[in-house]
Amino acid sequence: MEYSELYVKRIRSLCQKRGITINKLATMSDVKQSTLDNIVRGLTKNPRVKTLHKIALAFNMTLSEFLDFDELNAYSFEDDNDD
């Protein structure tokens, strides 16, 4: 799994657990619908920290809580060529 896919998985998982659509998340986070769609569809590979922070706040989480999940913590950068 690519690094950028981990954010998508996290966002989708939290939306599903909380019964929130991506459209609703865009409204709650004050992130443009198109920006969030691009992240979720994998078109934006490296979302800005500010964007992730807004998404985290919409989930009532700190940025560190949002980024603290098993798949991301276990990710190995050995085969990753992105900088």
Model-predicted segments: where are they?
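Residues in the helix-turn-helix
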Residues: 24, 35, 65
